């Protein structure tokens, strides 16, 4: 079936488009974007509306699967769609609300009206595989290896990368960050983090995390630049991030 979205303001920053245009869609794929009048089997009047690629929310925490009832929180996904978000990335800040492979399996089976990606949360892995772990204390090398192997299993199972909540697990050492992140190296997957500190120490904390990515030559993402943490330091912080892109 041919669907035409008509008379909308089409905004596509990637292709430098901002114009009133008509979009021709067939089987879920765009066939044509044209300024000329055209009709299809189904016509959607977008007069006064913006038509654009779906937004990607790279930082969500709503990756909950209700095992006993076997359902996902579809209302959250629908709320995201209402805001124009079509792809969501969960499992951030080191936290998974559901065991990653269980959640990904549920997404495949039950479906959601948005695309879902998932990070493997370091904090949850640490708590599960390290006996009597204490978030305030460093852990032994053998335990670090256990975390890395489990993270690798999750990455091979479909997770996009590893997330860290360094601020919430202050016992994480540089060695632990580097060794666990090696699981991302084979497929050049990403690591992201809520860094170790904020406010006056935000620059130092960001540099600590950047060092991990540079040492392993893998992509990184700084999950947050807090408004108060960046106050008076934002230009310096953005220059730092730009310098290592």
Please provide the spans of the model-predicted regions.
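Divalent-metal coordination cores built from histidine and acidic residues
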Residues: 60, 72-163, 184
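Divalent metal-coordination and catalytic microenvironments
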Residues: 8, 23, 28, 48, ...
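Active-site neighborhood of phospho(di)ester-bond hydrolases with catalytic His/Asp-centered motifs
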Residues: 52-59, 89-92, 119, 190-195, ...
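Short coil/turn connectors at secondary-structure junctions
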Residues: 1-2, 39-41, 47, 51, ...
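Short loop/turn motifs at secondary-structure junctions and domain boundaries
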Residues: 12-16, 69-70, 142-144
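Histidine/acidic residue-rich metal-binding segments in metalloenzymes
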Residues: 138-164, 169-245
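N-terminal metal-binding scaffold of metallo-dependent hydrolase/deaminase domains
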Residues: 1-39
């Amino acid at each position: 079936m041919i669907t035409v979205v008509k008379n909308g303001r089409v905004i596509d920053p990637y292709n430098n488009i901002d114009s009133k245009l008509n979009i021709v869609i067939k089987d879920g794929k765009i066939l044509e974007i044209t300024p000329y009048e055209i009709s299809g089997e189904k016509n959607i009047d977008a007069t006064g509306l913006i038509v654009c690629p779906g937004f990607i929310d790279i930082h969500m925490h709503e990756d909950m699967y209700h095992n006993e009832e076997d359902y996902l929180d579809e209302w959250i996904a629908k709320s995201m769609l209402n805001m124009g978000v079509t792809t969501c990335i969960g499992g951030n800040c080191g936290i998974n609300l559901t065991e990653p492979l269980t959640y990904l399996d549920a997404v495949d089976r039950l479906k959601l009206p948005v695309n879902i990606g998932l990070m493997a949360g370091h904090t949850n892995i640490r708590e599960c595989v390290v006996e009597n772990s204490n978030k305030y204390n460093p852990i032994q090398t053998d335990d670090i290896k256990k975390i890395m192997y489990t993270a690798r299993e999750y990455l091979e199972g479909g997770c996009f990368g590893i997330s860290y909540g360094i601020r919430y697990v202050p016992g994480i050492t540089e060695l632990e960050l580097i060794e666990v992140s090696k699981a991302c190296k084979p497929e050049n997957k990403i690591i992201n983090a809520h860094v170790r500190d904020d406010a006056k120490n935000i620059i130092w904390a960001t540099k600590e995390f950047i060092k991990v990515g540079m040492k392993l030559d893998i992509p990184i993402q700084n999950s947050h630049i807090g408004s108060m943490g960046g106050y008076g330091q934002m230009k310096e912080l953005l220059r730092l991030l730009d310098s290592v892109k």
